[in-house]
Amino acid sequence: MSEQTIRLTQYSHGAGCGCKISPKVLETILHSEQAKFVDPNLLVGNETRDDAAVYDLGNGTSVISTTDFFMPIVDNPFDFGRIAATNAISDIFAMGGKPIMAIAILGWPINTLAPEIAREVIEGGRFACQQAGIALAGGHSIDAPEPIFGLAVTGIVPTERVKRNSTAQPGCKLFLTKPLGIGVLTTAEKKSLLKPEHIGLATEVMCQMNLAGAAFANIDGVKAMTDVTGFGLLGHLSEVCQGAGVQAQIVYQEIPKLPGVEEYIAQGAVPGGTQRNFASYGHLMGEMPVEWRDLLCDPQTSGGLLLAVTPESETEVKATAAEFGITLTAIGELVTARGGRPMIEIR
């Protein structure tokens, strides 16, 4: 089988960040009765489900460490590698950091798919690393029943500039740097529903590097930041709210959306991860139309940054985003938690 005709998505049961283990199941897996080793220099661990771990070196600089990998979300091997690498590197930017090095993680069905195809995947990953200004310095591979690719990435950040997902404040406005609907469009393509004018749109968005995160770190008014990936906007927003003890009010019409996404939802192009996300986070949300839920719980692969910004810093954040070709519009705001109200209200 040639590299030109291969359809990688046929060789995996999941796709991109949509193949994440559901939050409810993950909570069971991570639960431990053992006493946890406490290291005072570990600034960010997994307590708030943040994007990466952060370790204070004690000299004003902290190290950021993350890993991310998944099964193919697109058929083209080079694009798969590029998307997976971009997605992994994003975790460093989401913490406000600068990536400095990456190593590859590769699982490959060597008796089913030619090694030349795996090489194309690696080349796509290397291309993304070059875009981020880092080397793909090595890696590890195994013979696996399904193709898997991703990176372990190391970054650095001034300790005082670390951006967490748990430090938002009431009054902050919410911004999203990429449109939603990646899971919907990739599902529509698998179902042969995708219109010609929408082919390649999801890949283009997934390949956009979240470089702006390192610049947002220099703005004091950016009180919290995370990237929106497999748990969807509402899943990752709920982590922001839970970490800070606040509630969110979202205006659906202000949320950036990929072209055609609502039409494809109406045609049933909803990935399986959407329902898993709703099953995990639905109890935290107010009433909304099903079609809104299907977009807001849509698992994103290499999605955008979600920012919580003080009103005083809104102009500076928008100007910084514009330097990276990003136009920002507030999609909602955070408010003081009130009893008897859902954590996230959509209107």
Curated annotation (Swiss-Prot):
GO molecular function: ATP binding; magnesium ion binding; selenide, water dikinase activity
Binding site residues for Mg(2+): D51, D91, D227
Keyword vocabulary terms for this entry: ATP-binding, Kinase, Magnesium, Metal-binding, Nucleotide-binding, Selenium, Transferase
EC number: 2.7.9.3
GO CC terms in record: cytoplasm
GO biological-process terms attached to the record: selenocysteine biosynthetic process
Catalytic function, reaction form: hydrogenselenide + ATP + H2O = selenophosphate + AMP + phosphate + 2 H(+)
Active site: C17
Keyword Kinase: yes
Role summary: Synthesizes selenophosphate from selenide and ATP.
Name listed for the protein in its UniProt record: Selenide, water dikinase
Annotated organism of origin: Enterobacter sp. (strain 638)
Gene: selD
